[in-house]
Amino acid sequence: VQVLAYLPKVSSIQLGSERSDLGWDSVRAIMDACPNASVSYTFWLYDKEFSTVDTTINLSHIPVEDGGAQVMQAMACMPDLVSVDMDSCGVSNEDMAAIRDAYPDVKVVWRVWFGDAYSVRTDVERILASQPSVGGMLDRYNSEALKYCTDVKYLDVGHNDALDDISFVAYMPKLEVAILAMDNWSDATPLASCTELEYLEMQTTLCTDLSPLSGLKKLRHLDIAYIVDLD
């Protein structure tokens, strides 16, 4: 690594593969020594080949049993990485969220399950979950995973009598249409974070205070029919 200090104009470095016993610490040291160079190093994640110059990691439906630890290690040496797809890899939502939070500039996607039978990828833009007879009745516990779906623009979780908490919408800043009617929630505070919201149905809920909606400047349609305790 020290000799690289004498090669300031080097633009490309080929390191071979991890089968050469060159560890991640050495790869990182070389990258740090030559910040302007493209450093190519071939490695394997869960029996699939990748390179440090790749822009994507696709592990969709490949079992991952270490909570994504190897992925995190590799991501630290992939400066051009744009996206990581870990759909149905068996990693917990908490571990996947930790990966996403550690690399906010990388699109990290996985699959979440909610209700009894609903599942979506975290990059989904449209969620329809208003048929308890099909996907199960939503409640505050089995709907919590929806908070990981931060790209949602259209959300329909109406007709869920047991849904008494909509905290998950606070994590949906792109939300434009929300159908939250005929549920059992009372606190509209999470909606204050949905500044792109244009259409909102919340009729026949237990909401008592609309003040959290005061900052929603793009809101054009609001249905509050049959809310009997509204101040």
Segments (PLM) and residue ranges:
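Concave beta-strand-loop units of leucine-rich repeat
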Residues: 1-22, 32-94, 101-190, 196-212, ...
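Intrinsic low-complexity tandem-repeat regions in disordered proteins
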Residues: 24-27, 96
